[in-house]
């Protein structure tokens, strides 16, 4: 039975996780994400799950990794400073192909920054925060409903591609309250277990899609798990250049080859747009209003909302660049995804940035003024 609720975005993330089958949460309180931990502490025991408050964010993500290898779905939630502490384990999860979800409710930064104010300043950290070559998936909600929906999708993507998936929220979306619809059931992608008996199983031998089968500890399969370069059996193989190349290339290709399948964008009024406004997360709310105001003023403006910043939706952004003469990137930082748009649109469209820091969202009038300026 479908039900409606009037709740915060953070609460919606927690409820989305439960609906998606999450049965383990480890975390450490940090503003503005703490409500997720509080809600998980309330909901998980009712579902037979486990909530653990760890000593810090390093331990939190380590605990999630361990729980996932025991066979459950796991998640943590944090904000900028805690996200920084998690980066070593992000790389470990990528190397060991551990499917998990991290919710980052972004706040003003760097360092301690603005704990109670909003930002989108962790977007590049989500992609490049840990050392080495690897790929992750990130989603960026702009509403409370999307906090629920994107968290559900994050778990399914994590299981499908055996990769850390990040839900990159912000203080505005995390703390706003809106009416949302929660279905009685959601589509859950089951983890792909072994298709051969234990004596024939190679834990990191990948089929054509590049994603290995994954048993749980205790299922009777031998599963060496190491952050070292490893062979298909999971055993350290760090001195083998060809083996390292083969492994890391597969870790990247299993995401990049499916980029168009993973990518999710929303477009409005872009068919005839001379100026396309590109945004993600909370600023998209102001962008939609500003574009409508621009149309009322006779300006052919449209907008492209990026729901999956990573892997970057190159196909959709390139199409927007070819279609429009000018692109305007709106984000709550001094320019992060702006550089990705510039890279993809090079030689096809003029790209401008409307940044915003200080903890506040763009007002529609600010965006409209920039659109009008670009239309001259």
Curated annotation (Swiss-Prot):
GO terms for molecular function: 2-oxoglutarate synthase activity. It holds the Pfam family PFOR_II. Keywords: Oxidoreductase. It catalyses: 2 oxidized [2Fe-2S]-[ferredoxin] + 2-oxoglutarate + CoA = succinyl-CoA + 2 reduced [2Fe-2S]-[ferredoxin] + CO2 + H(+). It comes from the Archaea. GO terms for biological process: organic acid metabolic process; sulfur compound biosynthetic process. SUPFAM superfamilies: Thiamin diphosphate-binding fold (THDP-binding), TK C-terminal domain-like. Coiled coil: none annotated. Its EC number is 1.2.7.3. Heterotetramer of the KorA, KorB, KorC and KorD subunits. This is 2-oxoglutarate synthase subunit KorA. It comes from Methanothermobacter thermautotrophicus (strain ATCC 29096 / DSM 1053 / JCM 10044 / NBRC 100330 / Delta H). The lineage of its organism: Archaea, Methanobacteriati, Methanobacteriota, Methanomada group, Methanobacteria.
